[in-house]
Regions:
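Donor nucleotide-sugar binding/catalytic pocket of nucleotide-sugar-dependent glycosyltransferases
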Residues: 101, 113-156
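A short helix/loop element that forms part of the nucleotide-sugar donor recognition site in Leloir-type
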Residues: 153-168, 234
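Conserved acidic donor-binding segment of nucleotide-sugar-dependent glycosyltransferases
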Residues: 282-291, 299-304
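Glycosyltransferase donor-sugar binding loop
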Residues: 147-148, 178-182, 201-214
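Aromatic "clamp/platform" in nucleotide-sugar-dependent glycosyltransferases that forms part
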Residues: 249
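A conserved mid-protein helix/loop that constitutes part of the nucleotide-sugar donor-binding site
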Residues: 17-24, 173-196, 212
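Short hydrophobic beta-strand element within catalytic cores of glycosyltransferases
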Residues: 265-269
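Active-site donor-binding acidic/aromatic loop of nucleotide-activated sugar
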Residues: 210-212, 223-231, 237
């Protein structure tokens, strides 16, 4: 039986948990699996580092089967969960001034072309890969992400505690935004949307270096927003919130949407976020000036029974997207393609 290596460049806590689950599941099926992390490769030049990592991975491969979470040109199965490089370029009109962007595009193309199978986390990314790289549809499988579902939800007590902690009005609904990349996930658009929303408590959570700029923007527009850094445990914010808005410019699939749904938040995002594929049309923001969405949000803020009804529906919806289901689907694709 062929040995499997799971490759990752930048190991985060979230990725590490997924990698361990995948490794253990493959071990239980009789595969010998190791996790290779290349974050310890040192280089002052990020371009040199990226090239060096890919060369080293290729040299080490021999007869191993590579499952890659990052872009490696020696990938057998590529888990394309971070979006498409050529799409990110469109968000930055000066992308050509960043040499690393060019190298990443080259490696991405090789990764896509050389891999046996690609697993995307949304049909948005699937369509983009098929279009940009002229990939045959049967080479790509879409598997939506999964989350650990909450064991209990007590929105009332969670809201009371958070409002007391932040010194905000308990009687007002909470509208939440969560991201560590404010530009990509639309913090600007979120703040602008708030200017059309009836009175509510607005909270932005995230570790973004540009936070002071967004604070100033909110102040200039006369919008009261509470900014908080990303906490170790964020679930209590989802549990306390009524509405979650993520007007992404581009995101392959924000798991924040799943987490918010699981705690009964009413969620809105754009069609440029793969997570929109699991939402009904009325919850998809079509443009930055989408009056239908702002009117709907204002309706929700004034109709508590409607809000409770949709909240219950969203909790039920989230139960379709568990880490167990996600892992089982990925294992099935691996088993069908390993040689």
């Amino acid at each position: 039986m062929k040995n499997i290596s799971i490759l990752e460049i930048n190991l985060t806590n979230k990725n590490q948990r997924f990698l361990e689950r995948l490794k253990n599941a493959l071990n239980s099926k009789g595969f010998d699996v190791i996790i290779k992390n290349y974050n310890n490769i040192k280089s002052k030049n990020p371009i040199t580092k990226l090239i060096k990592i890919n060369k080293l991975a290729k040299k080490q491969k021999k007869d191993e089967f590579y499952i890659c979470l990052d872009k490696f040109d020696s990938a057998d199965i590529y888990l394309a969960s971070s979006g498409v490089q050529n799409i990110y370029k469109k968000l930055d009109k000066f992308w050509f001034l960043n040499p690393i962007s060019i190298i990443e595009s080259i490696i991405e193309k090789r990764c896509i072309n050389n891999s046996i199978k690609i697993i995307t986390n949304s049909n948005l990314v699937r369509y983009q890969l098929e279009t940009i790289y002229n990939i045959q549809p049967d080479k790509i499988t879409t598997i939506y992400p999964g989350i650990n579902l909450p064991t209990q939800i007590q929105k009332g007590s969670a809201k009371m505690q958070l409002c007391k902690e932040l010194g905000i009005d308990m009687e007002l609904p909470i509208i939440l935004f969560v991201s560590d990349n404010f530009k990509k996930d639309g913090a600007k658009e979120f703040i602008e949307l708030l200017t059309h929303i009836n009175k509510a408590n607005a909270i932005i959570i995230g570790n973004d270096k540009a936070t002071p700029k967004y604070r100033q923007m909110a102040k200039k527009l006369g919008v009261r927003v509470i900014f908080k850094p990303t906490p170790k445990v964020i679930n209590r914010y989802y549990e306390a919130a009524d509405i979650f808005v993520l007007p992404s410019l581009y995101n392959s699939f924000s798991t924040q949407i799943l987490e918010a749904l699981s705690y009964g938040c009413i969620c809105f995002t754009t069609a440029q976020n793969g997570a929109s594929e699991i939402l009904k049309d009325e919850f998809i923001i079509q443009s930055k000036d989408d009056e239908n969405v702002t009117k709907f949000i204002n309706l929700l803020l004034s109709d508590h029974s409607l809000m409770l009804n949709i909240s219950a529906q969203n909790i039920k919806l989230s139960k379709q997207y568990t880490v167990e289901d996600n892992l089982n689907q990925i294992l099935k694709v691996i088993s069908e393609n390993i040689h």
